Amino acid sequence: MDMEVKTMPGKISIPRRFIFSEGKAIEHPDYPHYSNLLQKMNMPSVKGLEDRHNCVRFEKKCNPTFLKFHPYPPSVLPDYHLHYPYPPPYGRAYPLAPLRDDVPLGDPCSGFMSPGGDANLKPNIGRAIPNLVSFHDVKPQNRVPRPDKGFQTTIKRQTILAEELKQDRRWNSRKVPDISIKAKLGGWTSPMKVVPVPVHEHEVGTLSRIYTFDEEAISTDDSEPLVQLDKKYNIKDSFYKSSTQKAYEDVPWDKMLPPKLDPEETTVEKAADHISQCFSLKRYERLPAITQMVGGLWDRFQTRLFSAPAKPINFVSPSTRSKYIPLYTGHVQSTDADNVDNPYGDIKSVASPRHSKLQYTNSSRSANIPGYTGKVHFTATHPTNSNIPSREPSADSEMNRLLLQEMRVDRFRHQGPMSQMVTTVKPYNPFNKKEKETLEY
């Protein structure tokens, strides 16, 4: 097919191959499938198609690819606005240059959104990009994530976060929580009014007792002398005093103790199993990770030690369309054999992993539980454990029994060459059932 443009007066004809020119320049069959995943992962992208660093971006003059670059066809043509394909107007789909639609929006150095990509998306168009200035230099570990829905919950969490940041988070033994002060003053620490439990009479005497400490005690109630270990020892020194509290404050508890645990975002359990009451996550994920679906380009940019045991590292699946686990060496099937090599072919029809299913058991006829492996007659319509009265034998059952015994075939049929051999000398053939005949002369 001629690759040049065939121009006719008043009409532009474009070869059919250029309509699918994107598949022409792609050598790797999985590139169109993981190119979108690379943008989500902020992976450093190569320049140009086919990883050639834009060395083949120069096209011939009058190439139909340049029609997409111009916002409108030349106005000298009659009915230029009716020609196909009509180039897109200025906007998100407007290309920057011929064959350069894959413009990376992320900065390859920092990994964040580049200023050019931020300006290209424009405000109020497409996906909203969060502004980093609105967080007021809050550390990531102190930032409260936004819930999926609920505007009032977001404002409440931001208010709590602002109050916690203003407070001194260092350990202080003299600090008294506000909730304890409210409890001592008789205030309510809960939104609902709590009615105190009445005290019984036998507990009043116990609560009203006052225990005193007698330092000068010499003997116990049993008139036994106390054992004094040391005269210099003072029992009141073991009390908790302000000096003891001051000594504890000198200890760097913030460095010795683990940090305070922040409350969870939600109390919803992850992957809760209501049958086994096992609240652990599943061992195997249902779908492969994004890093396992981007092809060999992940290993290309992944930094590893030079002392790696095996190279290349087969960490990802060789085909992103097969949806198989990495290191899978089986055969990827498809309804059409040509779709395996076609980058736009459909191989998901039969490439999904198989799941073992129980064999179908017709329980409506045999009345047995599914998966029963006992002995049941193939024409029986009753369960095996049902009590069925035995029938009387028929008149010809004895005759059938004799016929079966006569028709019974021996297990060892002696069909081998040694068994069929006939010997005329002793000990003769042990399998020869012919009777011996005496010949008279």
Swiss-Prot record:
Summary of the tissues where the protein is detected = Testis specific. Expressed at the spermatid stage.
Keywords from the named record? Differentiation, Spermatogenesis
Pfam families the UniProt entry points to? SPATA48 (PF15073)
**Which Gene Ontology terms describe the biological processes this protein takes part in?**
cell differentiation; spermatogenesis
Could you confirm whether the keyword Ligase appears in this record? Answer: no
Task: Tell me, according to the record, the phenotype of the null mutant.
Answer: Mice have smaller testis and show impaired spermatogenesis.
Q: Which InterPro entries match?
A: SPATA48
Q: Its domain of life? A: Eukaryota
Q: What does this protein do?
A: Essential for normal spermatogenesis.
Stated name of the protein: Protein SPMIP7
Gene designation: Spmip7
